[in-house]
């Protein structure tokens, strides 16, 4: 593609590469979904079919390394980078083990130069990496795995519980998915730092966001910016009229939902987030709140606290659809939450897990201006305080660890 002397030749190799990458992803991840959906559509008009479906295990992390490859090809096509002649360097870029199965989604322009330069051991970088790994393990093992036990129990049998308990289950899943995914990202970034590699940041305290637009600038940052650079902007971005902005916003959120999995729940989840962000797009306020909340202050204002609470509730509502097994379950789950049973005493109230969540959120708030929460320990804290904190976190990992749960994003 790079050496093609004609535009048509360049386009041929470009679209061939795009087709091969997306073809593998579509075949393994979406074939059964489309086959079943097509059969359901035919049954509505009276035709009964038994579609052939795949009985294969989805390759772990296929959505992530497919996007690595796509960004590489697109950047070459746009003349942002030159093709990598060293096959080993290219292979490491696509399959660097810390990010292979669950991201972050790297760019060739960011990672390849780091792989090609000579690296030297950096004690400060190593120490910082170990701290981030420690915090990631705490988030995954202590918060996410404990929340998962109760979230799974409630979501698997929603008909057995009152609306108040279903709300508790939704809150548990809200913290589970954040601590599970951001915990993995912390471990990946910390591990890469041990090898002298700086990966893209993937989370920036999203639950302290004051609106949905800010939330999506802070949640799964590598995916959000990927869709912005390789889909939203090529579609015209925000340069066209209001209708173009609305259309492009819906496209990226629907595609983002579909990227997560072959289930209508993910597509509806993407559409919900597009609806939530639409008032900000229409009013031109989607670029507000670029800095972290309460910058340089310990406490937020009442207005900021209210905005964070409202955004958190909208996010929790969307996570219900994301977690549900199907659209019918999501609808019944939400309908029951907004029934009179919401005002009953919850049947599931694990005080120990709730206390752990509160402590966790206080630490996150304390360190929200840093790349990760406990990075602040290395800035001004005396050595005895730092080591006491590290050992306390390590002890919590062993003492308060929940039942082992697979990382949620391994399925994507």
Where are these regions (language model features)?
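Membrane-embedded transmembrane alpha-helical bundles that form the catalytic cores
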Residues: 1-411
